[in-house]
Amino acid sequence: MKEMQKIKAIVKQIIFYLKIILSFFYTFLLYLKIVKPKIIVRMNGGISSQMHQYLLGRIFTEKGYIVAYDLTFYKYWAKDNNGHFERNFDILKAFPYLEFKQSNGIESMAYILRFADKTDYFDHEEEDVFLYNIKPPKFLGGYYHSPKEIWKDLFPKYFHVDPQILDNDSHSLYMEIEKNIHSVGIHIRRGDLAVHNNAYGRPADLDYFNKAILYICSKIENPFFYFFSDEPQWIEDELIEKLPIVDAQYKIVNKNGSDKGYMDLFLLANCSHLITSKGSFGKYGALLRDSKDKIVVLCDDPLEYGWKDRLQNPVYL
């Protein structure tokens, strides 16, 4: 058994070094202009992160550049920051009509070794204006504060809700929400954002959700709340009894696991109003069906203020 493990380890190491050699050869072909240069965008995270990264690539296809997406995250890690929840590559399940080119392993390695952007993570909330000046070959592997046209122009151009991709259970709930003009979606992100996170700050707390529900109740007659979360059991066991609602006023949506999170995104989008938490899932749900009549409640946190110009009717509490 130990001998077999050693052999496997040696073979894996040989394959790794072969990939490095081939990646250098690929880079040589690039310099000789035998292969065309492109921009490769790394994809990772859940469905909303994938949507963001897809739009980042579209900035450059709109300029006429070749763009491909690196999916190695989903091959070797595919977890949240805590390593607890699965992160699946779902964007083509949610939006099967998208034009999509995947980079191969040799290509990605060549770009990472030679053409990786060195400023791919930022602590500030300003737009990453340097994106306007990028030309291929380049590897983009971070989370960028993208230019405003991503949200104003590209988001509605590329992303549309199609209930036909839903399974039977989710489609039935989608139609129920569609008929309920007083529907309010509440997204509660737990998992790796249940505690303080450097990128997102402190998590949305009980006081925030109480204020948000009371605010909605002051604006809407007979609201009905649909709860969406990566930990629905926690909502039922720990949260519901502490909120200012009664049994007839809510439903905890527990139909879709991490393999169908994109279906929850469509269900959330179909709600008339939204209460969001930290992270981008709830905001992307709002953007998919945004309107001036749609109340979207957000945490009153400077880290969330970047959404002011992206949503039509944001409310900070």
Task: Explain the meaning of each model-derived region.
Residues 47, 219-299, 303-306:
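Donor-binding and catalytic core of enzymes assembling or modifying cell-surface/extracellular glycoconjugates
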Residues 34-40, 78-220:
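Secretory-pathway luminal glycosyltransferase catalytic domains
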Residues 80-95, 235-246, 310:
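Short, aromatic/basic amphipathic alpha-helical patches
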Residues 52-60:
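Short amphipathic alpha-helix
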Residues 43-52:
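A short, glycine/small-residue-rich beta-strand->loop->alpha-helix junction that serves as a flexible
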Residues 12, 16, 305-317:
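Leloir-type glycosyltransferase catalytic cores
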Residues 2-34:
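Short hydrophobic helices that act as membrane-entry/anchoring signals
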Residues 67-76:
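A short beta-strand-loop structural module common to alpha/beta enzyme folds
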